[in-house]
Amino acid sequence: MPRSAADPAKAAVTKGLRQEAGRWLKAAREAAGLTQAELAEQVGLRYYTFVSQVESGLGRVPIEAQGAWAAAVGHDPAQFARTLLRYYEPELHRLLFGDAAEDAPRARQAGRG
């Protein structure tokens, strides 16, 4: 039986995955030699604080902006989107791509993160 969106354990896992995505995005930005402000400018954001929110796990890269973010950090757009999908929608990622160990994010325990 599916869990409710209000399920605290699921919410904790979702939060942990968003934080992992944020760390991955920050590492990609830093590897590209960009500041948050420079990335924001390259992807057409008015405020760099959105980049900060995404990197801290409080926000998500919108689907329609993932190609621009990928280009800005020098990543293949398809792989970039696939990586974000595994963090943002792990069940959909599993259905589309299976449970390949290299693609599966580590499910965090409710108390960790």
Predicted regions and their residues:
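A short, Lys/Arg-rich alpha-helix, primarily the initiator
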Residues: 2-31, 108
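Short, charged recognition helix plus adjacent turn
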Residues: 6, 81-113
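Residue-level signal for the short linker/turn that defines the boundary of a DNA-recognition helix
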Residues: 23, 33-34, 46, 61-64
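Residues within the helices of the helix-turn-helix
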Residues: 26-27, 37, 67
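Short alpha-helical DNA-recognition segment
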Residues: 31-53
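DNA major-groove recognition helix of helix-turn-helix
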Residues: 54-55, 65, 84
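DNA major-groove recognition helix of helix-turn-helix/homeodomain DNA-binding modules
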Residues: 62-80
